[in-house]
Amino acid sequence: MKLQVRVVEARNLPAMDLNGFSDPYVRLQLGKQRSRTKVVKKNLNPKWTEDFSFGVDDLNDELVVSVLDEDKYFNDDFVGQVRVSVSLVFDAENQSLGTVWYPLNPKKKGSKKDCGEILLKICFSQKNSVLDLTSSGDQTSASRSPDLRLESPIDPSTCASPSRSDDASSIPQTTFAGRFTQIFQKNAITATPTQSSSRSIDASDLSEISKPVFSLELSEDESSSTSFEELLKAMESKDQGSEPPSNLSGGVVVDQLFMISPSDLNIVLFASDSSFYASLTELQGTTEVQIGPWKAENDGESVKRVVSYLKAATKLIKAVKGTEEQTYLKADGEVYAVLASVATPDVPFGGTFKVEVLYCISPGPELPSGEQCSRLVVSWRLNFLQSTMMRGMIENGARQGLKDNFEQYANLLAQSVKPVDSKDIGLNKEQALSSLQAEPQSDWKLAVQYFANFTVLSTFLIGIYVFVHIVFAIPSAIQGLEFNGLDLPDSIGEFVVSGVLVLQCERVLQLISRFMQARKQKGSDHGIKAHGDGWLLTVALIEGVDLAAVDPSGHCDPYIVFTSNGKTRTSSIKFQKSNPQWNEIFEFDAMADPPSVLNVEVFDFDGPFDEAVSLGHAEVNFVRSNISDLADVWVPLQGKLAQACQSKLHLRIFLDHTGGGDVVRDYLNKMEKEVGKKINVRSPQTNSAFQKLFGLPQEEFLINDFTCHLKRKMPLQGRLFLSARIVGFYASIFGNKTKFFFLWEDIEEIQVLPPTLASMGSPIVVMTLRPNRGLDARIGAKTHDEEGRLKFHFHSFVSFNVAQKTIMALWKAKSLTPEQKVQAVEEESEQKLQSEESGLFLGVDDVRFSEVFSLTLPVPVSFFMELFGGGEVDRKAMERAGCQSYSCSPWESEKDDVYERQTYYRDKRISRYRGEVTSTQQKSLVPEKNGWLVEEVMTLHGVPLGDYFNLHLRYQMEESTSKPKTTYVRVYFGIEWLKSTRHQKRVTKNILVNLQDRLKMTFGFLEKEYSSRQQQQQVT
């Protein structure tokens, strides 16, 4: 039972903020179920018009509707509340209270404070939703079964309230009784249906029940297509914007686009005089078809009809009757949802179940030609009316029967209505991206964003007030400690007022400073074209909504970092924007392997070395998503700040393969070299079955599969499926299915354990996932440790060596180790040095150096130089300074007494930015001062504004003449600006502070290390 609540508007709300307004939103609660509306900014008469739906378990519950005022820094303020008893709604006429203004009550019962009013519509849905089944036995309601909450082909953002329907009924014109009879024909004599024991089924008639035969017989009084359209128009007028039902749990059997409008496709499929319907009956050979008229029910809120037919007799079975009910759950002119339920009591165990099929017709994507297209999605499930031991076999028969029948259905429909070619959809990418242009923000708009606030306004008014006071005031006599030119406060009140004025002016000056820094648009990876052939990922960043504000000004300086297959792209920084507009396009260089996920992270910019504040993050999973659905999508952000503000990003994502040739064959050839064994290309039928088994997109292809055992409490025999992006396991024992998969990128480690008695003498492959990854596959995990890592154990492979080599090759292809990344960076650095002939240091003379650090260390120069020696002291010092994955090349002689090397590491301070540091160092001997000169050029990768500058360091070490075994160190610092930016001072200051901290830490460690060595030598 569903309670529908529509929150329309409120009026005369009290002002809760100092600006004389409120930021109201509504929170609804029924039992443990909670929902809330959006926040309406600065409004005392807000309008929402949002619908909500709650499951009702107890009529004694109360619906609590609270109005609150959003506060960004403290707890939200309570405005008022309404309590409505569920039993009051249930006992009302038509189970509806109508649309009524309710007074908001204060928290304290005795208070007479006027809290305003709220307009609500509260009612019960007159019939259960398609997912709230009322039958008994094995059936499960949608509110309790996670299997029924699959992703809908309709936009999930509209999932506010369920659609209304009659009792769930109706399945398509196609049946699957033949599949059942083939399964049960061997047991037809001993196994009789629960409710059909009096019926005898001739085994000679069990052949073509899965080929329904329809001969259309319409009576004169049945509804015409005109009355059918009138009924739908009446239903459309009463549509309340409810959410179309989600796909049913049995799976999707048709998901196709057609070049026709949704309303026309609906007429083609369900009009009483439809020529398609007649052609389908002729093709499938069904006779004695009786199509009832469409009738309005529930005061026109739903439309329903009944169809009956007779299956033709065959050599195996006699004729079988079927009754089908079709009910419109939704019809609003754009989206149509029809639930069909079919009963076939004459098939074996036919009295124990009904089959339900859901047809969803919705608008398709926009085509370049401008023509309308529609998306047809057909899903199914079994509704068991009573328990039966043959449930697993019935489900298998239904699945195969529906698959065969709807292949005929889709092929016939494609002959009547032109399907959309995938090439036409691909062209839509160019059209979708061509309209995106990143427009620079004007200085006037930026000034309004910075200065249109209470701080500036109050400071301006106070300044005018003080100025007028100075004009009219008489100068006071000099007293106390005052003298000419110095006028001190003469009272505590004057002192407080002076302090307030100083603080206000300071804040205004800070705003002016930030405004001057933010005037110029900052660079990004927007417009950088991808290189190479392969899988090309294109991401269009449109806008962000309700990003969290971390600055005292109530705004943020957001930018986005996209990461896929180890490659990153960074957007520009939008200053003082909580709802920024980007309109930027990012292309990732072509990848040999199709990407599995796209990680999206939103940061607030405050200097390249400051601790990054994450405003939210999201993950776009290409394996679980249909790429066509990502062409225009709103991605909700995760994280404490993002979820509190309900932050979202508007993205357009396209994934194409730009290389020629056979993608599958090329990839398999690469894997064959790693495995050392030929890998056969799987047939299209096998690949299609693999994709449907795990719900994968069409570009996913099967590489190999192995029979093995999954080790849990008890070994489970099944098959391990390996593709370019996933590891999947499937087993079906006595009708109990075990199915899961996880990504190669989720695997942290793969181990091979020696054979044991429990593994039946076979080696065990242990796959350990990264913390909190692959949680959807935890059903197959052997253990789940305290760090949140899942471990999967597989053993008893028929050919263990081939399976192990294939697994390791695929894992290595998707997961590069840090050493491999270091090696790649070193090779790239060497090639760059050779091509530029050590030209990195040619510009050092143009850099302005300033001394930033100097001290005298009680260590000899020879020991100090171990800091650059590449040995244990070098490594420990870098780790102590927060440098991860540190690697360095050996010193090589460039010319007389000049040596050079390259280093690579990840700095903890910028690791949140996915930043890496590469540097080139040169050292030369200074004989006249008995010391060394070390020069270093550092380049920051993946850091905001990192491509705007290079860092230059110069270390001068010389032996102290006054004290033996003492080194005098001076460090000089300079920045080589490659591009102009108004943030030079801000970036320079940020880097300088962090550099000084790092030098103190490094030199302090060096002194302690030398002291410990001296003590060890004295002991020995």
Swiss-Prot record:
Keyword line: Calcium, Membrane, Metal-binding, Repeat, Transmembrane, Transmembrane helix
A GO term from the CC aspect: membrane
Binding positions for Ca(2+) 1 per the UniProt entry: 17, 23, 69, 71
Transmembrane segments: 454-474
Main location group: membrane
Domain named VASt: residues: 249-421, 848-1010
Induction remark: Up-regulated by Cold. Down-regulated by salt.
Biased composition (Polar residues): 134-144, 158-172
Binding site for Ca(2+) 2: 17, 69, 71, 77
UniProt-annotated location(s): Membrane
C2 domain segment(s): 1-102, 517-635
UniProt binding sites for Ca(2+) 3: 551, 557, 604-606
Protein name, entry field: C2 and GRAM domain-containing protein At1g03370
Organism, scientific name: Arabidopsis thaliana (Mouse-ear cress)
